[in-house]
C-alpha cells in the first residue's frame, strides 16, 4: 500500500491521489459575531496569507475595532449597532437584512470559511444565513466553529446545538471545537482570556491547515480541485495538526495529527482524508512513507486519501508538520461517532505565553498538567445562568 503513495501520476487502482497541477483559488474567511471576529483578527495579526478576510457583526463598537476594513454591519436598522442580545433570532434577522452586502462580499469566491462561536446571538443566528448565501452562489463552504463551555448554561448550549444544526444544512463541511475540551489540555492557572486565546489559535490552525494546502505549491501538490472533491457535501469534518522534531519526527507528527483531544471524535470511519506534510530540505521520502502509513492505518481501507508534500526552506528547527482533514462520516451508514484517542502524546510544557505554543500542543493535548475534565465525569449539571460573560469574550 505504501508503494502506491509514490506513483508519478494518478493511479486508478488506488484511492490515494497525487496531483502536480496548481489551481489558484479565491478563498475568503468570514468571522461572524464576537467569537468569529476574535478568531479572524488573530489570523490577521498572525499573518495568515493567501486569503481575503471579512468581519460581520451586529455590535458596531466591536466591529469598528476589527483588523480589516472588510466589515459588514448586520442589522443596522433592526439592532442599531447594539448587538443581538444573545438572541439567535435577532442575529438571523440582522443577517437577512444585510443579504445584499453579504452576497457582494462573498461573490467571486471559490471557497469560504465561516468561523463563529455557537451559543450567542450573532454568530449562532447569522452564520447559517451567511452559509446559505454562499451555497446559493455555488461556493465550497466550510464552517469552523466552537461550542460553549458547559458552565455557560443550558440555554447557551441548546442555542449552540440548534444553530449548529442550521449551519450544517448549508455548509459542505463543518469542523466543531467544543470549548469543554480545553479543560483536558490547559492548567487551572490559565485565565479566561488565555483560554479563549487558545481556542482562537485552534481556529487559526484549522483554517490555515486547509488554506496552506491549497495556496502553497508543494513537491507533491494538492490543489483546490483535490480539496473540493473531499470536502464538498461531506458533512462533519475533523482536523488535526501534528509537529515534531528529532528521531521519528514524521511518525510522531502523524500520531499527533490523528490524536486530537480538542476535537469531537477520531478520524476512524472517515470516507475522505486530505493530508499535507511539510518539512525542511532534510525531509526524506521514507519519512513521508512512514507518516502516510500511520494515517492509512487509522482510516478505512476504501477511504479516499489525498496526500500533498511541501519543502519549506524557512524551517530551520528540523521539524515536520502534518495537517490532516478527515470528512464524510455521515456517509458511513449514519453511524455515531465515538471520542477515541490514538497513540500517545509527546511531553510538552507551557510557560504561559500562548504565542509560543505550537498548534500541535493544542491538537495532541501535549501538556504535563492533566486537570479533571467535565467530559470525564465531573459534575456537569450545574446551570450557571447568572454568570455574565464580557462582550469581547462572548462566542
Question: What do these predicted ranges mean?
Answer:
Residues 1-395:
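Tubulin/FtsZ superfamily GTPase core signature
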Amino acid at each position: 500500500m505504501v508503494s502506491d503513495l509514490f506513483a508519478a501520476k494518478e493511479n486508478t487502482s488506488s484511492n490515494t491521489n497525487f496531483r502536480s497541477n496548481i489551481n489558484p483559488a479565491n478563498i475568503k474567511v468570514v468571522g461572524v459575531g464576537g467569537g468569529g471576529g476574535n478568531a479572524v483578527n488573530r489570523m490577521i495579526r498572525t499573518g495568515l496569507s493567501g486569503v481575503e478576510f471579512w468581519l460581520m457583526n451586529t455590535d458596531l463598537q466591536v466591529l469598528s475595532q476589527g483588523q480589516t476594513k472588510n466589515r459588514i454591519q448586520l442589522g443596522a436598522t433592526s439592532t442599531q449597532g447594539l448587538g443581538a442580545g444573545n438572541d439567535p433570532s435577532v442575529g438571523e434577522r440582522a443577517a437577512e437584512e444585510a443579504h445584499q452586502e453579504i452576497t457582494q462580499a462573498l461573490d467571486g469566491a471559490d471557497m469560504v470559511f465561516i468561523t463563529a462561536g455557537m451559543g450567542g446571538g450573532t454568530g449562532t443566528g447569522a452564520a447559517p444565513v451567511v452559509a446559505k448565501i454562499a451555497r446559493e452562489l455555488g461556493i465550497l463552504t466550510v464552517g469552523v466553529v466552537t461550542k460553549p463551555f458547559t458552565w455557560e448554561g443550558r440555554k447557551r448550549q441548546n442555542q449552540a446545538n440548534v444553530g449548529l444544526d442550521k449551519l450544517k444544512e448549508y455548509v459542505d463541511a463543518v469542523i466543531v471545537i467544543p470549548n469543554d475540551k480545553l479543560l483536558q489540555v490547559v492548567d487551572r492557572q490559565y485565565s479566561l482570556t488565555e483560554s479563549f486565546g487558545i481556542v482562537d489559535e485552534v481556529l487559526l490552525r484549522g483554517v490555515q491547515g486547509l488554506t496552506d494546502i491549497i495556496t502553497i505549491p508543494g513537491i507533491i501538490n494538492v490543489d483546490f480541485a483535490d480539496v473540493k472533491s473531499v470536502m464538498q457535501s461531506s458533512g462533519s469534518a475533523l482536523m488535526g495538526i501534528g509537529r515534531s522534531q528529532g528521531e521519528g519526527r514524521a511518525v510522531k507528527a502523524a500520531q499527533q495529527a490523528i490524536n486530537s483531544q480538542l476535537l469531537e471524535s477520531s478520524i476512524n470511519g472517515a470516507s475522505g482524508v486530505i493530508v499535507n506534510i511539510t518539512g525542511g530540505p532534510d525531509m526524506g521520502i521514507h519519512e513521508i512513507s512512514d507518516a502516510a502509513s500511520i494515517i492509512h492505518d487509522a482510516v478505512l481501507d476504501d477511504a479516499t486519501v489525498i496526500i500533498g508534500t511541501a519543502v519549506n526552506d524557512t524551517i530551520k528547527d528540523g521539524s515536520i508538520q502534518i495537517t490532516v482533514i478527515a470528512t464524510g462520516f455521515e456517509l458511513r451508514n449514519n453511524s455515531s461517532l465515538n471520542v477515541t484517542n490514538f497513540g500517545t502524546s509527546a511531553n510538552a510544557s507551557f510557560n504561559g505565553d500562548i504565542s509560543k505554543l505550537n498548534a500541535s500542543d493544542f491538537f495532541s493535548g501535549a501538556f504535563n498538567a492533566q486537570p479533571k475534565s467535565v467530559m470525564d465525569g465531573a459534575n456537569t449539571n450545574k446551570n450557571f445562568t447568572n454568570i455574565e460573560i464580557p462582550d469581547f469574550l462572548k462566542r
